[in-house]
Amino acid sequence: MSVKWEKQEGNVGKLTFEIEQEKVKEGLDRAFVKVRKTLNVPGFRKGKVPRQIFNQRFGEEALYQDALDILLPEVYSQAIDEAGIDPVDTPQVNIESMEKGETWVLTADVTVKPEVKLGDYKGLEVEKRETELTTEELEAELKQLQERQAELVVKEDAPAENGDTVILDFEGFKDGVAFEGGQAENHSLELGSGQFIPGFEEKLVGLKAGDEADIELTFPEEYHAEDLAGQPVVFKVKLHEIKTKEVPALDDELAKDIDEEVETLDELKEKISKRLQEAKEDSVAQAKQEEVIAKAVENAEVDIPHAMVHHEADHLMNHFAQDLQAQGLTPELYYQFTGQTEEAMHAQMEKDAEKRVKMNLVLEAIAEAENIEPTEEAIDEEISTLAEKYGMEKDAVRAALGDMSELKSDLKIRKAIDVLLDSAVEK
């Protein structure tokens, strides 16, 4: 196969490649077998017309497009391999020459993976973070657990305070007219939770059970409902009941209620301390990794093709939709609830996608600079891990992974991150 690659400005180039006569003939033969199955030609049973009759009646050129569709995936893949390029999207292929009995000539404007100019990536300074669990952190966790065991008790003849839960009716009015979505009865609301628009919960503080009030507020300018954004409204409210949290004492009995595997508060503290210590060490390690990667990426230069960003954004959007589905929602419902649009969400995803794409490109470049190649032992170990995780046989995992290119790429990137971490200087 004759292949020519002409690098142009940026990350785009022109790929010229040929399909030789013998290969063209193979494609035409396969195309005829495909087309003949659907043909109805007088004098012949369906799907039984001879090739010679087909050529006389329709012309061999009638098979060209089908033959090209059949051959193109194979010959294009071979062409990019011979040209030594790494396309980042599927280009439009143009026909330069497609004459009978001759070699076919095709061209494609191909966007390729960009070159990365690495900056400093070894010996990068990172913040030294404390990994030892503090007494304050343990006490804060115990307080949270203690408050989770709290019971709500009715507050008799006392005003509502932040932290109390009130049961109320409310109805919102704009210009004296009730607006949609502004009404509820026997609604439970924890004061200070920030569930309502600014000012609503604050103005309930001080009211008692049985009180009625008119609360004058202005909706935020960025509120999702355009007809209410920035508009003054009045909420008519009636408090039916006020409940306050009754927090139990932090003792052995509470410890057993929190965790049935312990008998005393000291045992609970020891168990929680171990969990929090491990979590803090993991958090510190993750923060160090993120910081050193961010600095290596910042020091590198790369011109990222928009196609890569767009593809990654699409990937993130698909994950977002799957996460919503797991919660019983659809993207359409999410946009309706939040007032956001799909276009705005995709634009935000593109910002995140650009960061992810650059990070991966830089880490791949570091792996290449360090001549990192995963060993067979590392590959086999990763396959064993995946097999155990998903409850599959190792051979099934290997079959699912195919040529292992994705797995090898992941292992290379992990090793590249290790290079950054091992050489980082904590200060």
Curated annotation (Swiss-Prot):
InterPro entries: PPIase_dom_sf (IPR046357), PPIase_FKBP_dom (IPR001179), Trig_fac (IPR005215), Trigger_fac_C (IPR008880), Trigger_fac_C_sf (IPR037041), Trigger_fac_ribosome-bd_bac (IPR008881), Trigger_fac_ribosome-bd_sf (IPR036611), Trigger_fact/SurA_dom_sf (IPR027304)
Predominant localisation class: cytoplasm
Residues making up the signal peptide according to the UniProt record: none
One GO-annotated biological process of the protein: 'de novo' cotranslational protein folding
Enzyme class, UniProt record, top EC level: isomerase
Reactions mediated catalytically: [protein]-peptidylproline (omega=180) = [protein]-peptidylproline (omega=0)
The UniProt record lists the keyword Manganese: no
Pfam families the UniProt entry points to: FKBP_C (PF00254), Trigger_C (PF05698), Trigger_N (PF05697)
Alphabetical keyword list: Cell cycle, Cell division, Chaperone, Cytoplasm, Isomerase, Rotamase
Keyword Cytoplasm among record annotations: yes
GO cellular component: cytoplasm
Domain PPIase FKBP-type, chain residue ranges per copy: 163-248
E.C. code: 5.2.1.8
SUPFAM superfamilies: FKBP-like, Triger factor/SurA peptide-binding domain-like, Trigger factor ribosome-binding domain
Annotated localization: Cytoplasm
Protein's job: Involved in protein export. Acts as a chaperone by maintaining the newly synthesized protein in an open conformation. Functions as a peptidyl-prolyl cis-trans isomerase.
Free-text note on domains in this protein's UniProt record: Consists of 3 domains; the N-terminus binds the ribosome, the middle domain has PPIase activity, while the C-terminus has intrinsic chaperone activity on its own.
Family to which the UniProt record says this protein belongs: Belongs to the FKBP-type PPIase family. Tig subfamily.
Listed name of the protein: Trigger factor
Gene that this sequence comes from: tig
